[in-house]
Every structure is written in C-alpha cells, then in structure tokens.
Amino acid sequence: MSNLDNPGIYYQERFFANDGVPDTGRELIAEYRQLITQFRNFIRDFSTGGFGMIYRDQLKRNYFSHEYRLEINLNHLKNFDEDIEMKLRKFPGKVLPALEEAAKIVADEITTPRPKGEEKLHDIQVTLTLDEYPTSLRQVKSAQVSQVVKISGIIVAAAQVRSKATKVTLQCRQCKHTIPDVSIKPGLEGFALPRTCAAPQQGQMQRCPIDPYIMLPDKCECVDYQTLKLQENPEDVPHGEMPRHLQLFTERYLTDKVVPGNRVTIVGVYSIKKLIQKKGGDKSLQGIRTPYLRVLGIHMETSGPGRTNFTTFTPEEERMFKTLAQRKDAYELIAKSIAPSIYGSADIKKSIACLLFGGARKKLPDGITRRGDINVLLLGDPGTAKSQLLKFVEQVSPIGVYTSGKGSSAAGLTASVIRDPQSRSFIMEGGAMVLADGGVVCIDEFDKMREDDRVAIHEAMEQQTISIAKAGITTTLNSRCSVLAAANSVYGRWDESRGDDNIDFMPTILSRFDMIYIVKDTHDVLKDATLAKHVIEVHVNASAAKERDIAGVPKTATTDSDGVMTMFDTDGFLTIEFLKKFVTYARLNCGPRLTPQASEKLVNHYVKMRNPVVNADAFKSGKKAHNSAIPITVRQLEAIVRIAESIAKMELQQFATDKHVEEALRLFRVSTIEAAATGNLAGVEGFTSTADQEALNRIEVQMKKRFAIGTHVSEHLIVQDFVARQHYRESLVKKVIDNLVRRGDLQQKMQRKMLYRVR
C-alpha cells in the first residue's frame, strides 16, 4: 500500500498503476524537485521585457483577491526553458503537480507575512493558455493520450457542479487501522479501495475481511468539479456526417465558466477512462477505454457576435476590406456576390446582405437591449431558388445553421433538458438557435412546421434569449442570431385571388420579420428567355469545371502566390472566403449609429406613413380622403433603423447617413409594405390598410344588424349578398366571419354551411 502515496505512480496515466518497471523512487524524487526549482525560477523571474514580473505579480494579485489560481502561457514557458515546456506537453500528469507545487512555494514567499486569520497557505490551481491554432476534434487520436492538446467547439450540455475528493482517509471496519491523506488521481478515473487490510495481522483474535476499508467523509479534502459536453464546430463537420462530441472535466476555478451555446477553445490533457458497463456486460470490452478531456484552460470566444475562426486579420486583409468599403459600388457589389449563380432577385439579395452584416445591438440605460440582427422571410412559389439562397447564406455566414421545418421541433430549435446517463441528474442541451448564437439560422419549409414549434421561437426572434423552466432547471440562454426563413403558399402556388389565405401564419410570428418578400413565378417572355439562358450557362460552366477536374487542371486558388487572400473570382464577384471574412470583420469592428439628419428624416417618413396626407377638397368638406396606406408600428420603425445601420456597416461607416436611410426605406417598401399593400398580410399587426380596416368594421356592423341573436343563416348566402349587392371583397367578408367565430359571437353548424349567432 506504500505505492498509494507515491506521486510518481499516482500521476502516471496508464491502464494500470504498475507497468512492471522496477523503480527505487530516488531518481523520480530528484527529478520532481528539479522541476519544482525550474518552475519556481520561471514564476519568480520571467519578464517580457518590462520592469514587472508578470507571473509573480499576477499570483500576488490573485492571492490577495482570494482567487488561488495562476494562468501561464506555454509560449512564455517555451521561451524561458524549452525542455520543461516539452515535458509539460508530453507528460502533464507528472509535471503539472510540480508546477502547482512551485506556484504554492512562490505564493508563500510573496505573501508572507499574511493577515491574521489567513495564515494557512492555500493550494494554487495552474491554468494554461496556448498561442497556436486549435486542433479539430476529429484529428485527436490515441497518439495524443496523456498529452496536452488544444481544441475548439461548442458547449452543448453542462452538468451541475459536484464535489470530488482529492485526499481521503481510509479506516478498516474491523481493526480501525487508518491510512491518512491518500491522494486521488485527478480526472474521472475514480479510486479503488485496497482489497485487504494493511495493518499487521499478528496477535489479532479475528482476521480482517476482504474489502475492509471505508472512507471517513469528515477527513476528506474535496474540490468542485463539473462535466461538460463539447461538440465540434458546425463548419468543421463534413457533409453527411454527424458532429462528434467529447466529454470535458473541469475542476476548481474552471467550473461554472460556460453555458450551453458558448463557443470555446480548450487546452487540456487528452485522457481515457474505463468504459461503463452494465452487470453481465461483454468481457471482451475490458481493455476498451472512453476518451475525455481534463481541462487545463478555457477561453470563451467573446470577441463579439459573428464569432468564427477569423478572430485576427492580417494588415493586408484589413487594407483589402477598407479598399472595398471605399468603393462607391460596395453595397451593389456585395449584393451581386450573394449567390451569383441565381439570376435576378436583386432586392432579395440586398436584404440578405443586410441580414449577414446586421445592425448595431444596443443596451439601454435601464438594462433593456435592442436587437441588431435582421430577420427575413421569403414567401412564394416553388422553384424560385428560395432554398438555394438559404444554402448559400449557411456557407457565407460566420456561424450558419441550416434546418428544415418538418425536421425541426421546438426543443431542437431552442433547448432541451435531458437526463445525464452517469449522474442521473437533468442537464440542458442547446438547440439550433443557441448553437447559432452570433450567426444565422436558415429555416427552410417554414410553413411545414407545427404551430407549437413555431411559437417556441417567438422569444428568440425578438428578445434574442431562450428561457427554460423544465425539470427544476430555470435559466436563460443567448440566441443572438438572425433568422432567414422560406415558406410556400398553402395552395402550393401563390393564388392572387385569395390574398392572405395563401399563408397560414399567426400575426405574432409575421410581425417579428423585418422584411417579408412575396416571390412569384410570373410569366414574362423576355424574363423567361434571359433566365433560361442563365440556367443553361450555369450548367455548362459546371460541366466544364468537372471536366477540368478530371483532366487534372488546377482550380482557381483562393490565395495568390504570396499567400494573400483573393478578393474576386473569375466572374468579377467577391469570393466566398473573402465575403465571409469581410462579414466577420465588419461585425467585429463596426457599430454604426444614425446621424441627427438621418434620424430626423426617418421620423418625418414615419409620421407620413402613419398619418397619410389629406387632400384639400376632402379637408374642406370635412371628410377624410380614401387611402390605402399601411400604418406601420414602432416594431417596423426599428426594422428600418437596423436595415440602415447594416448598409452603413457594409461601407465600414461609423454613422448611417441620409442615403442609407433612403435605401432602407426603399427595401422596406419593396418587401413588407408591398406585400401588405396587396392584401397578402391583411390582419397582421400594423399591416392592414386604413381602407380595409374601415371596410372590416362596416361589414361587422351590418352583419350583426342582418340577423338577431339565436337565428340561423346560410354562410354562402350572406357572403354572396355582401359581395354581389354591396360590392365588398369576398376575402374581407370571410375574414369578418372568421373573427366573429373566433371571438365566440358566431358558431358554424351543419358542416360549416350554417351560421348561428350566439351573442
């Protein structure tokens, strides 16, 4: 049992504690002490050229702040002594305890004398950072077991914080023999109690039984630990494959640092643990081990919305971004580079460009935030390239998640609570809108979703949070993402005569979209000929590219011979890689605000749209002029502000000027206002014209006068009477009937043929 106290054996990360190698322990002790001395010198003396010793000062500052931790950059350690840095990377199980012991010694030196009541010296936790590109989760193999690795991904689940013993005291139940301060291996390996009593058995009346030891809870030293679930980044997952996961083990000051949905970069020890088996499991699995990562450092990607791998940009790339932003046609060029293989749809592409860049997120003095992300809905006929636009946005967005309406549930889009198979406690897993925090969620077949699932994303689209209150877990997750949705008509193709009957959406979900486009497949000889030529040309070029690949002709490089990123492709459009980096750069470094002149112009337009001009003759006669203007609400006003800010962001401007507001108003008119003016959004908050609203009120008053309470009338006859004799639109009459039925004033009977007035 003496080996239990041997630090050399305790920190070895192998399948078994004893490798069969004879070891006196003297060499290990001497090496251990030498490592402590080297690390002690590093912490005390390392400097980057200034007057201060960065790690000594950091340790002193943290210790007096009651944060007993020290963060060390491995590149600094490499500059100080490359040999011990290599040992720490290759054998962290052996070397890390020496580093923490050295930190504790230095802390004792620099904090003596300590205040009264704080004389006890606390253990120091050492966390690591690494200045190198993270490894993909798929590239971490068995060769890296027990070595330091750096990987990135998304946290999708987090268990609750628990306690784990680091030192235990064992006592024999029979003879009360005690083994104090038995060290427990860090990580998820656990600890096996000795099978036999270590006390001398001579002279005892009764021998101690097998498995005699128990732990004394009041004499154990414990630390906090938490297990997390890491999923590889969506952009790293090959098409057609499932994203891979890895369990993370955090302890002490690294617990409670992240929540599901956070993008993180992890430095840790790639470790293995025994495979958990049920009773009577397969005996051939005894040698199988499950990988997990013992975390030594967590870096959250909090550089802002639009987080991606492009967190740093070269001076040459920044020069290219500013050159593009200074062009007069920058806005037009970016819009044309959105899915260039799709013909036409210029305004839709401009709106998608605005969605990619987004407006400026604002936090008000009272703590309320105003979203800067833009939501766009595409409604219309099949075959109008809506899904292709969504697929392109998924590629070019810094963080893009694509999902289909029929295959999406409320839990899959927002968050779910599941039971942890190990601890049997409930843990939370983030859905698509949580994982896309800082990016774009593309929802295809939006009309095929169940209504209950659509309601679940109301909060995420406006407040940009997801509140969870399930299974004893009450929390709020961030979902700061834009939504690009595509839907078809209820009747397959768009029917002009049916107006708003083409869509089956609640007004609450439609009002959360900043721009709504009705995409129709109209018949036009000239347009059809141009479109057909474009489609054929795309297919011919694709076939030629495939033949070049077969012949071994190299593809067009995304970087030139000097390694500088290419700005334009062969057709004169921006390359996908450049556009993706430019979107990231603009979202990180630009947050435009409206100028006073632009604000005043927007206020004037808002007032005009809310209160249309009354002509002089009608004013003199005391009557209002007949108008069909759409009185917009404050929610649509905020949408116009976001659109103007996004256009300014494409030009890397700090302020949105008059021209940006004019273009934002134009985009809003050709999208939402045009869709509402044609009656396709009638009944939606703020999208019913004044004339239609007055007609609806008149029809309701006349209908209630036509038949008394308790009488029956044919629905067909009353609709025909209002349409033929009083010349109202059939859609308005049916809408009034639907409203009265919904309010409970009318009931439909006899297979919806008769109407019965209840009140």
Swiss-Prot record:
<dbReference type="GO" id="GO:0005634">
    <property type="term" value="C:nucleus"/>
</dbReference>
<keyword id="KW-0238">DNA-binding</keyword>
<keyword id="KW-0963">Cytoplasm</keyword>
<dbReference type="GO" id="GO:0006279">
    <property type="term" value="P:premeiotic DNA replication"/>
</dbReference>
<protein>
    <recommendedName>
        <fullName>DNA replication licensing factor mcm-5</fullName>
        <ecNumber>3.6.4.12</ecNumber>
    </recommendedName>
</protein>
<dbReference type="InterPro" id="IPR018525">
    <property type="entry name" value="MCM_CS"/>
</dbReference>
<dbReference type="InterPro" id="IPR027925">
    <property type="entry name" value="MCM_N"/>
</dbReference>
<keyword id="KW-0067">ATP-binding</keyword>
<dbReference type="Pfam" id="PF00493">
    <property type="entry name" value="MCM"/>
</dbReference>
<keyword id="KW-0131">Cell cycle</keyword>
<keyword id="KW-0539">Nucleus</keyword>
<dbReference type="GO" id="GO:0006270">
    <property type="term" value="P:DNA replication initiation"/>
</dbReference>
<feature type="binding site">
    <location>
        <position position="370"/>
    </location>
    <ligand>
        <name>ADP</name>
    </ligand>
</feature>
<dbReference type="Pfam" id="PF21933">
    <property type="entry name" value="MCM5_C"/>
</dbReference>
<keyword id="KW-0235">DNA replication</keyword>
<dbReference type="GO" id="GO:0016887">
    <property type="term" value="F:ATP hydrolysis activity"/>
</dbReference>
<dbReference type="InterPro" id="IPR008048">
    <property type="entry name" value="MCM5"/>
</dbReference>
<dbReference type="InterPro" id="IPR054125">
    <property type="entry name" value="MCM5_C"/>
</dbReference>
<dbReference type="InterPro" id="IPR041562">
    <property type="entry name" value="MCM_lid"/>
</dbReference>
<dbReference type="GO" id="GO:0003688">
    <property type="term" value="F:DNA replication origin binding"/>
</dbReference>
<comment type="function">
    <text>Acts as a component of the MCM2-7 complex (MCM complex) which is the replicative helicase essential for 'once per cell cycle' DNA replication initiation and elongation in eukaryotic cells. Core component of CDC45-MCM-GINS (CMG) helicase, the molecular machine that unwinds template DNA during replication, and around which the replisome is built.</text>
</comment>
<dbReference type="Pfam" id="PF14551">
    <property type="entry name" value="MCM_N"/>
</dbReference>
<comment type="similarity">
    <text>Belongs to the MCM family.</text>
</comment>
<dbReference type="GO" id="GO:0004386">
    <property type="term" value="F:helicase activity"/>
</dbReference>
<keyword id="KW-0547">Nucleotide-binding</keyword>
<dbReference type="Pfam" id="PF17855">
    <property type="entry name" value="MCM_lid"/>
</dbReference>
<dbReference type="InterPro" id="IPR012340">
    <property type="entry name" value="NA-bd_OB-fold"/>
</dbReference>
<dbReference type="GO" id="GO:0000727">
    <property type="term" value="P:double-strand break repair via break-induced replication"/>
</dbReference>
<dbReference type="GO" id="GO:0005524">
    <property type="term" value="F:ATP binding"/>
</dbReference>
<dbReference type="GO" id="GO:0005829">
    <property type="term" value="C:cytosol"/>
</dbReference>
<keyword id="KW-0347">Helicase</keyword>
<dbReference type="InterPro" id="IPR033762">
    <property type="entry name" value="MCM_OB"/>
</dbReference>
<dbReference type="InterPro" id="IPR031327">
    <property type="entry name" value="MCM"/>
</dbReference>
<comment type="subunit">
    <text>Component of the mcm2-7 complex. The complex forms a toroidal hexameric ring with the proposed subunit order mcm2-mcm6-mcm4-mcm7-mcm3-mcm5 (By simililarity).</text>
</comment>
<dbReference type="GO" id="GO:0003697">
    <property type="term" value="F:single-stranded DNA binding"/>
</dbReference>
<dbReference type="InterPro" id="IPR027417">
    <property type="entry name" value="P-loop_NTPase"/>
</dbReference>
<feature type="short sequence motif" description="Arginine finger">
    <location>
        <begin position="511"/>
        <end position="514"/>
    </location>
</feature>
<dbReference type="InterPro" id="IPR001208">
    <property type="entry name" value="MCM_dom"/>
</dbReference>
<keyword id="KW-0378">Hydrolase</keyword>
<feature type="domain" description="MCM">
    <location>
        <begin position="330"/>
        <end position="536"/>
    </location>
</feature>
<dbReference type="Pfam" id="PF17207">
    <property type="entry name" value="MCM_OB"/>
</dbReference>
<dbReference type="GO" id="GO:0042555">
    <property type="term" value="C:MCM complex"/>
</dbReference>
